[in-house]
């Protein structure tokens, strides 16, 4: 079986897993919001271990943003390093993908509402809400799902 993972490592980021479920390919989508605890990420990735799985991961490669403070840059770097550590430890092959590269694939810019619109078009049955109580679609879920789709298109 094949699984394609997309990770938006930001503070409001997410991990998305597209799992091939049938032939012709149909995909199950799993979205996990970022939390202070990496356990949900680890469990999602560990469930795809073993010789019967082919896993490919696209990790968004972003740097410091203009105007960010030292503390927020440090926190982002910490999270980014933790995610790379988890992927490396679990032997999940991953590619660092700059936002401009994966966004070009979908014909979008940095406007988060565009990301959500493209996600809804590609995955009309997937909820992008962070929690059931949310009213607004989550751009972290959208970015992670688009990264997973980018991985599927390039490594599928």
Locations of regions flagged by a protein language model:
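Phosphate- and other anionic-substrate recognition elements at nucleic-acid/protein interfaces
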Residues: 1-156
């Amino acid at each position: 079986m094949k699984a394609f993972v997309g990770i938006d490592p930001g503070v409001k980021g997410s991990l998305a897993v597209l799992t091939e479920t049938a032939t012709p390919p149909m995909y199950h989508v799993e979205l996990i919001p970022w939390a202070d605890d990496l356990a949900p990420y680890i469990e999602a990735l560990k469930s795809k271990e073993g010789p019967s799985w082919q896993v490919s991961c696209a990790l968004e490669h972003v740097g410091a943003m203009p105007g960010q403070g030292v503390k927020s840059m440090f926190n982002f770097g910490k999270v980014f390093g933790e995610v790379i550590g988890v992927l490396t430890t679990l032997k999940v092959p991953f590619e660092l993908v700059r936002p401009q590269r994966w966004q070009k694939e979908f014909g979008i810019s940095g406007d988060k509402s565009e990301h959500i619109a493209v996600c809804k078009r590609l995955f009309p049955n997937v909820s992008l809400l962070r929690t059931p109580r949310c009213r607004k679609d989550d751009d972290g879920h959208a970015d992670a799902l688009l990264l997973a789709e980018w991985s599927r298109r390039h490594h599928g």
